């Protein structure tokens, strides 16, 4: 499987239009962006560049998962009762997204919480999560590129996504 950079760009444009349309009349004053994993940063940056007139200031928030399994945000925390958009690279078992959603609801009581994922892995979900928008369905294989690393922690910098063996 290989998803080319052109296919990614086309899908980003499509997702950005759908997300822009969704938020056009729904936001009061703020849209908080949460990017759970490092692998989602290129997707988030490219997607946010294409989102038009979201109706609010955008706040880019990322997190790290510390040793005690607590969510630690870099930058500022979401504000209570704000709209939150989670931008995730891959939805596989649903554990990470489910835990993050629970945490955000408990700590910040968002007025609206939506999720966009680049990849939806065809795998048995341990936790079902309502995904608002998704880019591509992929098989249950290790994928890398476009921010996601391979088994050796490399190849994040590739402009495409693949699961093919590399020499």
Task: Please tell me what each predicted stretch does.
Residues 1-167:
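PRPP-associated nucleotide enzymes
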């Amino acid at each position: 499987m290989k998803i080319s950079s052109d296919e990614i760009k086309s899908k980003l444009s499509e997702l950005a239009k759908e997300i822009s349309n969704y938020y056009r009349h729904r936001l009061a004053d703020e849209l908080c962006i949460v990017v759970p994993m490092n692998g989602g940063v290129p997707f988030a940056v490219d997607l946010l560049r294409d989102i038009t007139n979201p109706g609010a200031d955008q706040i880019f928030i990322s997190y790290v998962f510390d040793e005690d399994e607590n969510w630690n945000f870099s930058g500022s925390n979401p504000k209570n009762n704000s709209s939150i958009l989670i931008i995730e690279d891959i939805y596989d078992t649903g554990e990470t997204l489910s835990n993050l959603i629970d945490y955000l609801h408990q700590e910040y009581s968002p007025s609206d919480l939506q999720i966009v994922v680049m990849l939806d892995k065809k795998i048995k979900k341990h936790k079902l999560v309502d995904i608002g928008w998704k880019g591509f369905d992929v098989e249950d294989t290790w994928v890398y590129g476009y921010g996601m690393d391979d088994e050796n922690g490399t190849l994040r910098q590739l402009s495409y996504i693949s699961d093919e063996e590399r020499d």
